[in-house]
Structure formats: C-alpha cells, structure tokens
Amino acid sequence: MLNLDFTHKTTQATPRLHAVATEFLRVSNDVAELHKLSSKLTSDPYLFVEFVKTIRGFLSVQTALGLSGEIDTVFLQVIKGWFPDLITETFSFLIVVRIINLFNKRANSKVYPDILRRIGNNALYLTRNPLRGICLVEKAINVRDPDCTVFIALKLHSHYVELSFEELGSNIVEKLLSVGESGICGV
C-alpha cells in the first residue's frame, strides 16, 4: 500500500482533487480498478492536468504507470492532447518523461517520434519556459531527427534574434545553425 499521508495538504483545498487522490490510494493494489480510475480521471482533462501538477497526484499517477499497458495508453492519450500544459510544470513534466521512457522500453517506436513532433510544433511556446521548455527543445535538436529539427526551425524562424539574447535561448539558435550547416535541414 502506498503511503501518501505527507502529501495530504496538496489536494485538500480542492475537493475533486482530494477525492481522486483518496480513490487512487484506495485502489493502488488492484490493476483493474486503477485502469477504471485512470480512465475516469482522464475523461476530464482539466482535472487530470490539475491533479498531476500536485505532488500527491504526481505520486499517484507515477505508481500507476508501468502496471499495465492499458493504463499507460490511457495516460498517453491525455498527455498527447495536453502536451504544452503538462510539459512546463514540474511534476507533470516528470510524468511525461516517465511515460516516454515506458513506451521506449516496450519498443513502441511510434511514441517517441510523436512526442518529438509535439516538441517541434510547440517549440515557440516551450522556449518561453527557461527551465524545462528550452532544455526540452535543446534535447530534441540533439536527437538529430530531421523532421523534429525542421519543425523547431520553422516555429522559431522569426525569433532567432530574440532567442539569441537569452542565456539558454542562444544555445538553441547555435544548435539550429550548426545543424543547418551540416545539411540535415535547411535552417
């Protein structure tokens, strides 16, 4: 049984979040019940996003991930739909990273390119977040996936000068220009 007593106050102010967290705690040993609860939670994406932003929600979802492929797929679908909102928050960012790693371990080759495409499509938004967003865009460029790099280059094209004046943004511009020189994409 998972002990989340120390996180009780993080969801106590919002009754809906508290009810979901309590339910997760109650069914944490039953995979079938966790699947039902995961489906119920992700049916309201706003609730899911708010839930995984709390430490209690993060820990609850973290324990459910990896227990079954069905649970992971349910969470992946909501992550795809709410990617920009989840990727810039501390705890939900860790959930996204964990689910990417789970699908990579299972050799599901479709998830990683899909996430890279989402990073590319949201590159401008992500560069506005200096902690996670810029680092994520930089890592996506380092993967050297041509499609992702082209998406990033196109989304940031008219913002190179602005980014070059930012401490971490200049790294992205430098990497895009070096990738462009190597002939991977026309930057």
From Swiss-Prot:
Pumilio repeats lie at residues 20-42, 43-78, 79-116, 117-154, 155-187. It comes from the Eukaryota. GO terms for biological process: regulation of translation. GO terms for cellular component: cytoplasm. GO terms for molecular function: RNA binding. InterPro entries: ARM-like (IPR011989), ARM-type_fold (IPR016024). Keywords: Cytoplasm, Repeat, RNA-binding, Translation regulation. It is found in: Cytoplasm. The keyword Iron-sulfur does not apply. Disulfide bonds: none annotated. Sequence-specific RNA-binding protein that regulates translation and mRNA stability by binding the 3'-UTR of target mRNAs. The pumilio repeats mediate the association with RNA by packing together to form a right-handed superhelix that approximates a half donut. The number as well as the specific sequence of the repeats determine the specificity for target mRNAs. This is Pumilio homolog 26. It comes from Arabidopsis thaliana.
